Swiss-Prot record:
SUPFAM superfamilies: N-terminal nucleophile aminohydrolases (Ntn hydrolases) (SSF56235). The keyword S-adenosyl-L-methionine does not apply. InterPro entries: Ntn_hydrolases_N (IPR029055), Pept_T1A_Psome_bsu_arc (IPR019983), Pept_T1A_subB (IPR000243), Proteasome_bsu_CS (IPR016050), Proteasome_sua/b (IPR001353), Proteasome_suB-type (IPR023333). It comes from Pyrobaculum arsenaticum (strain DSM 13514 / JCM 11321 / PZ6). It comes from the Archaea. It catalyses: Cleavage of peptide bonds with very broad specificity. HAMAP family: Proteasome_B_A. The keyword Protease applies. This is Proteasome subunit beta 2. GO terms for molecular function: threonine-type endopeptidase activity.
Length: 203
C-alpha cells in the first residue's frame, strides 16, 4: 500500500463588522516537497467578492474562474452585482454535481453586499455553512485555535486582518506543508484590497 501524499494549504476567513478578510499562505507542496512559495490561493472575483481555498492548486484556479465568469455574466445580464450567498449557492451546485469526481478543494466565499458582510464555508462536495470565522486545510487546527481566542463580534476589518495573519503564522510555524508568506484580501463597502505579508521564521 502506498503512502498518502499530503497536499498542503491553509486558508482563513473572518467576518468583521465593516467587511470581510480572506487570507491564505503561499506554499505549494506535494507531500513534503515544496513546488513553489508563490502560489496564490486567494482570488478576487469582483470588487465586493473573493474566495480563498485549500487543496489542489489546479482545482482552486478552476473554481475561481467558474465563479468569476458567472459573476460577470450575471452583472452583464441584470446590471447589478450578484449577492455573496447567490454566488456561494452556484458554486455549491457545481461542486455537488462533481461529487463522484470532486474538486479537491475546500472553499471560503467572502464578500459584502446590500445585506452586509458574509463569510461562507464549503467542503469539496459543496456543503454550505455561513459563519463568523473559519479555517481550512492542513493547518486549520492550528489556525482555528487562534481565531477562537481572538474573535469578537464587534471586530473591525483592520483587527480582523491582524487576527488572520496571526492565525496563519501559527499554522506556518507548525504545519510543514504551509508557508511561503501570506496573501490577503480585505473587502468592505469601498471595494476589495489585496495585500501580501512576508513571513520569516527562525529555523
Amino acid at each position: 500500500m502506498g503512502e498518502e501524499v499530503q497536499i498542503g494549504a491553509t486558508a482563513v476567513g473572518i467576518k468583521a463588522k465593516d467587511g470581510v478578510v480572506l487570507a491564505a499562505e503561499k506554499r505549494v507542496s506535494y507531500g513534503f516537497y515544496t513546488l513553489s512559495s508563490a502560489g496564490r490561493k486567494v482570488f478576487v472575483i469582483d470588487d465586493k467578492l473573493a474566495i480563498a481555498s485549500a487543496g489542489i492548486i489546479a482545482d482552486m484556479q478552476s473554481l475561481a474562474r467558474i465563479v468569476k465568469i458567472n459573476a460577470k455574466a450575471y452583472e452583464l445580464e441584470t446590471r447589478k452585482k450578484p449577492t455573496v450567498r447567490s454566488m456561494a449557492k452556484l458554486l455549491s451546485v457545481i461542486m455537488f454535481s462533481r461529487r463522484y469526481m470532486p474538486f479537491f478543494a475546500e472553499v471560503l466565499v467572502g464578500g459584502v453586499d446590500e445585506e452586509g458582510s458574509h463569510l461562507i464555508v464549503m467542503d469539496p462536495l459543496g456543503s454550505l455553512i455561513e459563519d463568523n470565522y473559519a479555517a481550512l486545510g492542513t493547518g486549520a487546527k492550528l489556525a482555528i485555535s487562534v481565531l477562537d481566542t481572538g474573535y469578537r463580534e464587534d471586530i473591525t476589518l483592520q483587527d480582523a486582518k491582524k487576527l488572520a495573519v496571526k492565525a496563519l503564522k501559527a499554522a506556518i510555524e507548525r504545519d510543514p506543508v504551509s508557508g511561503g508568506g501570506i496573501d490577503l484580501v480585505l473587502i468592505d463597502q469601498t471595494g476589495a484590497k489585496e495585500e501580501e505579508v512576508k513571513v520569516q521564521l527562525l529555523i
